[in-house]
Amino acid sequence: MGLHKLRLAAAVPVTFSSRLFLKPFTNTLTLGLFSRHLQPRNKPLLVRAFSASAAVQDIPATQTSDSSVAARPLWKAAIDFKWIRDNKEAVEINIRNRNSNANLEAVLQLYENMVNLQKEVERLREERNNVAKKMKGKLEPSERERLVEEGKNLKESLVTLEEDLVKLKDELQHVAQSIPNMTHPDVPVGGEDSSAIRQEVGSPREFSFPIKDHLQLGKDLDLIDFDSAAEVSGSKFFYLKNEAVLLEMALLNWTLSQVMKKGYTPLTTPEIVRSSIVEKCGFQPRGDNTQVYSIDGTDQCLIGTAEIPVGGIHMDSILLESALPLKYIAFSHCFRTEAGAAGAATKGLYRVHQFSKAEMFVICQPEDSESFHQELIQIEEDLFTSLGLHFKTLDMATADLGAPAYRKFDIEAWMPGLGRFGEITKVEDWESVTAHLNRLRRVLRKGKRIFQPLSLSTL
Amino acid sequence: MGLHKLRLAAAVPVTFSSRLFLKPFTNTLTLGLFSRHLQPRNKPLLVRAFSASAAVQDIPATQTSDSSVAARPLWKAAIDFKWIRDNKEAVEINIRNRNSNANLEAVLQLYENMVNLQKEVERLREERNNVAKKMKGKLEPSERERLVEEGKNLKESLVTLEEDLVKLKDELQHVAQSIPNMTHPDVPVGGEDSSAIRQEVGSPREFSFPIKDHLQLGKDLDLIDFDSAAEVSGSKFFYLKNEAVLLEMALLNWTLSQVMKKGYTPLTTPEIVRSSIVEKCGFQPRGDNTQVYSIDGTDQCLIGTAEIPVGGIHMDSILLESALPLKYIAFSHCFRTEAGAAGAATKGLYRVHQFSKAEMFVICQPEDSESFHQELIQIEEDLFTSLGLHFKTLDMATADLGAPAYRKFDIEAWMPGLGRFGEISSASNCTDYQSRRLGIRYRPSEPPQTGPKKGKANLPATKFVHTLNATACAVPRMMVCLLENYQQEDGSVVIPEPLRPFMGGIELIKPKHK
């Protein structure tokens, strides 16, 4: 029985959880538009970092919703263990700075064991091949018998070792997934309060009269209906009416046209996707407090962001260098359970189960990701400045980055009805992590394979 | 134990099934944009046609997915049994014309039984009240003992009869739901081929070059990606790219602005709703071959049309007459499993699991529904004429109406890439069929001259509203029409004039050089 060929896969074990309820209260309302945190996965995954073969098949889906160690994953992350081993001090410091609970020692140990076991397996295979070769020639019956016996023993040992190897690789992947992305050198080290202000635009408007919050305005101007939606659908759903409908369409139309001018390709996406895609993007559709709605009777889920179906377009692909960069502005409805989000930061339109969003997504060469990160944040700042908003752009500190982000800029706008700033967008540079997840590669002119980084921006 | 107060409810036992695979093949591709057909429900429902009280509570949700007769429904339709009984010949003819499998005899029989049982129950209650009254006075001990005994017996009989009554009402509702709406006298009787042409606009464009279908155009112009979507989501999903995104937004923007001019209120809606709302609108979320996606671990579903959440806005309400008519143009994404739809009519954008749609919905007084039906179809015809489409409006024959529709106009547009007409919109007058299930009523502003029974003291009795729905724009089907009809020999596609301002002035979708 040969080693199962498995699709390169991955799941950075992250969940959509609101940063809000994990952080101490400040004057800034962090809405956790799309935060990811690490959580050890209980499902073992197999890593295929050493196989040169690109063609793989899916492991039969035996994933169950309970965390059984025996459950085989559908796919694996192409994690660069050699690099981790060779840079272990930096990786350790990074893990600490990010408050991650990744266990680097365990990873390195398992990796060593795995490498050794792999060598042993290969050695046994070679011996068995030799035996098979010898048996092709003319032999004495006793010699033949001896070889048959030897072949059988080798085969039995191999089967055992190969099973062990599979388990070891699963375990290694399981532990290794917790390891967060490396961090940009300019990112401030520390918690939320250490985040640096990259820019502040405008100032809070001075009102000469008592002001209303958006809920009151929505009622008074007959723009938003939460009450009917609570009957029809449940809490955190709403209807938009009258000018609010036109406003939503205007926002999306205008945003699309502005961003298209910068060379982004407009896109609409499926809002139902296979759950494996959701996982590859780093979310746990079936975990407790999952943010993801699943469809009954299928392996499908609703997307929480267009990032998921857009990332999926190019999965398991090799792109030509000349095709890069790929720049998309993707529009979709987004669905989130908001499980676990409670308290004041759920009022009205702040936290809803369904909303429209335009998302920018960039696939580029590694050396370009930093400049695209700057391009994305610049586009956002320009958009919000044009709309006359008062906002600040934050360079998020290490403990506030999600696992995939190499660097993250959040924009928080002033919301007078609430008397605080609230997050309206973020821009993440995912560097190579998502590239691992979706197995994107770029073939350089020189023919060397390198993983591409991704830059993401939400609007 | 009193009669359980139950919420006005119902579920017409219908499913979203495509008319296509139920009808013989003709030169018209009936895409069954939104058809409903009858199917007996296995779950009994309780009817509340006789209770004057409007305030009710939900029956605890004990619905299970297997059809157990003991399962209590969450709500009931306010079906007018007296009217059915008094007009039974007309109802029977209607059932036959519509090829419905409703069993009128069974309904009438159950109704009789129910009425009689109800009388018996009321009689026993009155007796028990009398006994209780007598016991308030001064009595001989033996007399008191006798009355106590009598009271006990009456109570036991009542409990039994009341349980029977509940079961009977459930059974009655279960059978009665199959009964379709009555039919407009002008509707042709018969199958699909009997549908009458109300109007035909334009003529098929003559092409001087070999034409492509929308799939080919979508590939060549880099507008539609089905392949990636098949990997990411499955078949019948797609990405729109480049000008197609602008085209979708232009279609919706333009449609919205045109319809708003006619006094329709724009609306966006939740796309996740409780399954009971879906049922009240006449769909079976949990039947075999259901068109409805359900959400795991909840009682929620994805909507297949904005008609559902819009109908839900005013459910269990009494509107003022002065508030009517309510006219909405609602925009939403729609999700359909398309279970059971197979064959040639599933190609490309014809039949997809997710699409954008603008839907018109009207709530009005009964006497106005006919004129609103005309208004809706006129709006649709004007929209499609403005876009330069060649289409015909059909007055659908009786066998082709869904259960809720009193009358239905379908518009089928010429799709040259397929060489046939394909349904792009549908306008239905559902009269009071949905409102009896959703519980939408209105209170007339003045008492009528001849005195029918009054509701609350000095207030005129409430009546059920009429509801209508009509597709203003189903984006994928429109895209098929526009791409295929407006293609040029050089592979480009012309944008119809009304849409250009909504697309930043683009006049042409040109092939891109790679």
Curated annotation (Swiss-Prot), chain B:
Signal peptide: none annotated. Disulfide bonds: none annotated. Keywords: Aminoacyl-tRNA synthetase, ATP-binding, Chloroplast, Ligase, Mitochondrion, Nucleotide-binding, Plastid, Protein biosynthesis, Transit peptide. One of its GO terms (cellular component) is mitochondrion. Its EC number is 6.1.1.11. One of its GO terms (molecular function) is ATP binding. L-serine binds at residues 305-307, 359, 471. PROSITE patterns: AA_TRNA_LIGASE_II, UBIQUITIN_2. Disruption phenotype: Lethal. In heterozygous plants, aborted ovules. ATP binds at residues 336-338, 352, 423-426. It comes from the Eukaryota. Its main location: plastid. It is an enzyme of class 6 (ligase). Pathway: Aminoacyl-tRNA biosynthesis; selenocysteinyl-tRNA(Sec) biosynthesis; L-seryl-tRNA(Sec) from L-serine and tRNA(Sec): step 1/1. GO terms for biological process: chloroplast organization; mitochondrion organization; plant ovule development; seryl-tRNA aminoacylation. Gene3D superfamilies: Bira Bifunctional Protein, Domain 2, Serine-tRNA synthetase, tRNA binding domain. It catalyses: tRNA(Ser) + L-serine + ATP = L-seryl-tRNA(Ser) + AMP + diphosphate + H(+); tRNA(Sec) + L-serine + ATP = L-seryl-tRNA(Sec) + AMP + diphosphate + H(+). CDD domains: SerRS_core. Belongs to the class-II aminoacyl-tRNA synthetase family. Catalyzes the attachment of serine to tRNA(Ser). Is also able to aminoacylate tRNA(Sec) with serine, to form the misacylated tRNA L-seryl-tRNA(Sec), which will be further converted into selenocysteinyl-tRNA(Sec). Consists of two distinct domains, a catalytic core and a N-terminal extension that is involved in tRNA binding. This is Serine--tRNA ligase, chloroplastic/mitochondrial. It comes from Arabidopsis thaliana (Mouse-ear cress). The lineage of its organism: Eukaryota, Viridiplantae, Streptophyta, Embryophyta, Tracheophyta. The gene is OVA7.
